[in-house]
Amino acid sequence: MSLPKTANGMDKLKLCYLLLFYLGSSSLTEVSGAQTCEIDSVLCTSDLSEPDDPPIFHDLTTKEIKSVQTYLYHQRDLRLLRPGLAKINTSFIQGMELYLPNKKDVIHYLQSKVPTPKPPRAAVVTIFRGDCDPAVVEEYIVFPLPWPTQHRLHRKVPYYLRPFNDVEFATISDFLTKQVDGVLRQFLEESFGGRLINCGNRCLNFQFASPVGPSVSNEPGARKSWYWLHQLVEYSALHPVDFAVLMKIVGCVYTIEKVYFNNMYFNSLQEVALHYRNPSFPRLRIPYPVDSKQLFSKMERRGILFPEKPVSPPRQVEPEGKRYSVKYQEVKYMNWKFNFRLSPGLGPRLHNIRYHDRLIVYELALQDIVVFYSGAEPPHQYANFFDSSYMIGMNLQGMVPGVDCPTGATFIDSHILTESSLKPAKLINAFCVFEQNTGDFLRRHISKTSPDGPFYEGVPSIVLVLRAITTIANYDYTIDFIFHHNGVLQTKVVPTGYILPSLYTKQNENKYGFRLNNKLIGNLHHHLFNFKVDIDINGQHNRYETLDIVLDKTSHPVSKKPYDVWYQNKIKHNLRKTEMEALFKYDFDKPMHHIFYNNNLKSPEGNNMAYRLVNRGMSKSLLPECSGNEGTGAWMRHQIAVTKRKETELTSSSVYSAFGTKNPVVNFRNFYADNENIVDEDLVAWVTMGTYHIPHTEDLPVTHTPGLDLSFFLSPFNYFPEDPAMGSRDSVRIEAVDKNNLKRGIKIDKQTFPEKMTCKAPIGNYFEYILKRPNVIFDIQ
């Protein structure tokens, strides 16, 4: 929906805010006795409607999704069933997303100086073919959009590798509940104080599953998972009961293969029941928790309240309107311009990132989030989670203004297709965009005396942030793409949410974590994040070089000691020529800078006009290569890996990663195993960040964020003749009228610091809005 044209600027402003009313944006309110906060409505150019003719990087529109559905449902050979009728042994659409044209075609279209036809749009559609023998996952490319007439098979994947989905979860939950309740109802009630069926307010539930891939079970084609039992109170992850079942799925046959209870393994539910009838059988009593605001696992305000009175916290304002625009998933901000979209499986991706209209990054995209737990009992021992298999992008929804993003941010919905809905599902508030003052400065210096001074010059650190938050079961991950005024691009990840503890026993005390209360151990786990950075510095023919900082042994001319030497550091240029040479594992004894450049372009000083990659979130994986599930995440072996870009190597992971550990659908090791030349080639940097988390009592009920943020940066390195932010109107310069006579006063040069403007910060009506529409934030049907 476009903004209506009006004669009055303030009317236009109100319409702009009305378009975003539930997002927390509102016009600024005049404070009594203060100057009115006049806003230049021209700046407020956000258009969050869907285009009739989508730009090349735009997500599939609802019209395109519906037309692809209609086309596929008419293909009788696919035997597709509609949502609601689909079962795991039928054929149904699992999801779809944009399928980008080849990069060469896209670059040609973007850079053409004459009118050029846009490459045709297409969708990649994932279909679960449970109706086939053998069952299989099929991916099809459907084109051209918006009115498809053709489709072709993209790839086939073994059915046991399929990602988790609602249809399967419902089937498994029903199977486990009936099987376990039918055999062990009395056992569960006496041991854990609750039931699986007809449980009232004392419910037990199989909330979490630890996948066991073929490389772990050494049973090709088998899809296994340990399902953990929890007491179903807020939050269930903090109420484990030391009971789990190993479920095996082959085709459409479900069996319970093992049962774990109280540090003992059993071959069946019946075996547990038989032993339980024996009076000598070790009992375990875990009382069902009393639900109250004081329950340790509950996120309810409690303890000593602060501040002393309910005084509102600080809020930022935009006194003259927004300084960025969003239209058709393209953001323009100062000298930056970029497109963004959402992959339902792998999460947020940015494209065509430009600074001063010069392409810096063709694609910046999350690839996977991995969490590897450790523990004494099987649910934690095998808890190696590849979150792509849980559909990272589908779990973006419900960011709250004033907490998750500033109140005045622009909130943006995404539309996806899920297997459980015939219509495109709207992920409300999937993204937010906002400009903020970080409270730091971009640069500053003060010189108080002659001969240089007296003067002061400084620029506040103002940035634009594109944010997405994905919630995968118990954990929440904030993913920020941060655009600095000086051409620096920052990518930041912050984990928070609930930990997955285990029941305290003597066997796991202190070995895998600390005791958090009278019944829990906070299990050690390792978070890892992988990003793709398709760097294009002055074109697609780039080099990757490390500037190695090495010891320089030189003469010591001022020393009176004969043959004395002086040690300092020097730079050694190290051009990485092949992919194997471009695998980086951090070594504290070998400091270096990582730079990317086009060798055919030099600065006036003769330097390579480069961008530097800085990884400030490095974490080493200790797992032996190819052990357990490690092979699926081969990217975690290196903090940076640089490879030659290929259309067949578009992602380092896939939604099939959880069970594909024996023969991964995407094997990242193959990206560099052929050891191709990377000199003057189109290069991709694969950046891995991570952190080890040893939970402590302050992680109850929820892990806090300070100290957990991880970032990597792309920073200009001899790319500009000087700081490109020297032109910032946000700068302040203070100097003496006469530097030899301060008594003559000072002069102040500032352009964006209004002196008499006193405004209330935007409050918005978001909370009133969700009272009437709770599905905005929660999955309520």
UniProtKB/Swiss-Prot annotation:
Alphabetically ordered keywords of this record: Calcium, Copper, Disulfide bond, Manganese, Metal-binding, Oxidoreductase, Secreted, Signal, TPQ
Annotated cofactor note: Binds 1 copper ion per subunit.
EC number per UniProt: 1.4.3.-
GO annotation (BP), single: amine metabolic process
Name this polypeptide is given: Putative amine oxidase [copper-containing]
Annotated residues for binding of Cu cation: H525, H527, H693
Annotated organism of origin: Margaritifera margaritifera (Freshwater pearl mussel)
Signal peptide: 1-34
Binding residue positions for Mn(2+): D534, D536, D682
Positions annotated to bind Ca(2+) 2: E579, F671, D674, E676
EC category name: oxidoreductase
Tissue: Prismatic layer of shell (at protein level). Expressed primarily in the mantle with highest level in the mantle edge and lower level in the mantle pallium.
Molecular functions per Gene Ontology: copper ion binding; primary methylamine oxidase activity; quinone binding
Positions of post-translational 2',4',5'-topaquinone modification: Y475
Pfam families for the chain: Cu_amine_oxid (PF01179), Cu_amine_oxidN2 (PF02727)
GO cellular component: a single term: extracellular region
Residues reported to bind substrate: 385-395, 472-477
Disulfide cysteine pairs (residue numbers): C199-C203, C405-C432
Reported cofactor(s): Cu cation; Ca(2+); L-topaquinone; Mn(2+)
Superkingdom, taxonomy of origin: Eukaryota
Summary of subunit composition and partner proteins: Homodimer.
SUPFAM superfamilies listed in its UniProt record: Amine oxidase catalytic domain (SSF49998), Amine oxidase N-terminal region (SSF54416)
